[in-house]
């Protein structure tokens, strides 16, 4: 599983390839398990952010904290497009730009969903 292929280019960076290098015969599903944990944790964060945004009064510090966690998780598996959206969202939080946060969060959810589908296909194809 050392080549993430063209369909994943732009979605995953070298961090994902480093995870693949840690996978061995003793733990053949390591990358898939790490990815599953990422999607479980990120679903929780998306839910928390959704709830915070639905309140209408924006707590930019709380939103930034959630997004900081999301960015860290995304960085750890090499989710480059999701990570980029996290960075943009945090910039809007620091600027107090609610509309920018809302717009970026929609794009982040789209990139996250696309990544999930691509990884599911990738793991199925590599079995």
From Swiss-Prot:
Q: Which residues carry this modification: Phosphohistidine?
A: 68
**What GO biological process term is on the record, naming one?**
phosphorelay signal transduction system
What the entry lists under SUPFAM superfamilies is as follows:
Histidine-containing phosphotransfer domain, HPT domain (SSF47226)
Q: Where is the HPt domain?
A: 27-122
Q: How is it modified after translation?
A: Two-component system major event consists of a His-to-Asp phosphorelay between a sensor histidine kinase (HK) and a response regulator (RR). In plants, the His-to-Asp phosphorelay involves an additional intermediate named Histidine-containing phosphotransfer protein (HPt). This multistep phosphorelay consists of a His-Asp-His-Asp sequential transfer of a phosphate group between first a His and an Asp of the HK protein, followed by the transfer to a conserved His of the HPt protein and finally the transfer to an Asp in the receiver domain of the RR protein.
The primary site where this protein sits is: cytoplasm
What GO molecular function terms would the record report?
histidine phosphotransfer kinase activity; protein histidine kinase binding
GO CC annotations on file: cytoplasm; cytosol; nucleus
Compartment annotation: Cytoplasm, Cytosol; Nucleus
Residue stretches spanning the membrane: none
Where does tissue-level expression of this protein occur?
Answer: Predominantly expressed in aerial parts of the plant.
Tell me which UniProt keywords the record has, alphabetically. Answer: Cytokinin signaling pathway, Cytoplasm, Nucleus, Phosphoprotein, Two-component regulatory system
The UniProt function text for this chain reads:
Functions as a two-component phosphorelay mediator between cytokinin sensor histidine kinases and response regulators (B-type ARRs). Plays an important role in propagating cytokinin signal transduction through the multistep His-to-Asp phosphorelay.
Quote the subunit structure annotation. Interacts with the B-type response regulators ARR1 and ARR2.
Domain-related comment: Histidine-containing phosphotransfer domain (HPt) contains an active histidine that mediates the phosphotransfer.
Record-given protein name: Histidine-containing phosphotransfer protein 4
The gene is AHP4
């Amino acid at each position: 599983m050392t080549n993430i292929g063209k369909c994943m280019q732009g979605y995953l960076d070298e961090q994902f390839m480093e995870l693949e290098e840690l996978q061995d015969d003793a733990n053949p599903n390591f990358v898939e398990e790490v990815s599953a944990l990422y999607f479980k944790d990120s679903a929780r964060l998306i839910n928390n952010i959704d709830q915070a945004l639905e309140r209408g009064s924006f707590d930019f510090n709380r939103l930034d904290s959630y997004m900081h966690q999301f960015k860290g998780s995304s960085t750890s598996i090499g989710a480059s497009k999701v990570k980029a959206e996290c960075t943009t969202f945090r910039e809007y939080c620091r600027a107090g730009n609610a509309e920018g946060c809302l717009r970026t969060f929609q794009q982040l959810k789209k990139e996250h969903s696309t990544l999930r589908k691509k990884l599911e296909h990738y793991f199925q194809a590599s079995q």
